[in-house]
């Protein structure tokens, strides 16, 4: 697939997600969380292209959190943002030391790291008056999270395309919700984004997500529709076919 075709495909699915879930309204100030990885770069690049087209009237801003990880170098990232004329701020907060101190060797860092990062993001968005917080999770993240929740937490849940935060102060959006990771990888390579590796995540390759990712990949080899069917299942819930008493009144279920 050519560079333009990949970009066109991704933009199509981003616009579909924006419209399906009314993610961005006219006049919104959208804060895109840029981690330095392929997903967040792709999200920012595509949203910026859509903004430039002019059919969606919103402002865009890149928020970068420097978590004081060893080897962090954002000079190329700054250059890329300057070249694209995207306003941004790089905020330094040493969450790396906290995570390394609190989490025993061999355990997963992601949960604590995410909580610390989320708190900083929420505070910054509120202080600066942003109406939407855009995250770079894609289709594969959504379906992997579904299985991880079932297998390891005993819950049927995932990452919704649009979410009101627990404190009711922030609206989070995931415009890449319909986009496949393989297309994002291709697009990121073509765009030659100056990626910044995560020394925490990249040092833990044998995590639950990697195992679930392999499982879905293996199933997709037998049936290519497995990933798309899983995504479709997230919007095709049948409460009466499950066991949640809060969703369905089983105790009072009788023949009239």
Curated annotation (Swiss-Prot):
GO cellular component, one term: cytosol
UniProt cofactor note: Binds 1 [4Fe-4S] cluster per subunit. The cluster is chelated by three Cys residues, the fourth Fe has a free coordination site that may bind a sulfur atom transferred from the persulfide of IscS.
Annotated signal peptide: none
InterPro entries, sorted: Rossmann-like_a/b/a_fold, TilS/TtcA_N, tRNA_Cyd_32_2_STrfase, tRNA_thiolation_TtcA_Ctu1
GO molecular function per UniProt: 4 iron, 4 sulfur cluster binding; ATP binding; magnesium ion binding; sulfurtransferase activity; tRNA binding
SUPFAM superfamilies: Adenine nucleotide alpha hydrolases-like
Motif PP-loop motif, residue numbers: 35-40
Reaction catalyzed: cytidine(32) in tRNA + S-sulfanyl-L-cysteinyl-[cysteine desulfurase] + AH2 + ATP = 2-thiocytidine(32) in tRNA + L-cysteinyl-[cysteine desulfurase] + A + AMP + diphosphate + H(+)
Main EC class the enzyme belongs to: transferase
Biological or metabolic pathway of the protein: tRNA modification
Binding site for [4Fe-4S] cluster: 110, 113, 201
Keyword Repeat: no
Protein localization: Cytoplasm
Keyword Signal set for record: no
EC number: 2.8.1.-
Alphabetized UniProt keyword annotations: 4Fe-4S, ATP-binding, Cytoplasm, Iron, Iron-sulfur, Magnesium, Metal-binding, Nucleotide-binding, RNA-binding, Transferase, tRNA processing, tRNA-binding
Oligomeric form and interacting partners: Homodimer.
Function text: Catalyzes the ATP-dependent 2-thiolation of cytidine in position 32 of tRNA, to form 2-thiocytidine (s(2)C32). The sulfur atoms are provided by the cysteine/cysteine desulfurase (IscS) system.
Family to which the UniProt record says this protein belongs: Belongs to the TtcA family.
More details: The thiolation reaction likely consists of two steps: a first activation step by ATP to form an adenylated intermediate of the target base of tRNA, and a second nucleophilic substitution step of the sulfur (S) atom supplied by the hydrosulfide attached to the Fe-S cluster.
Name of the protein in its database record: tRNA-cytidine(32) 2-sulfurtransferase
Record gene name: ttcA
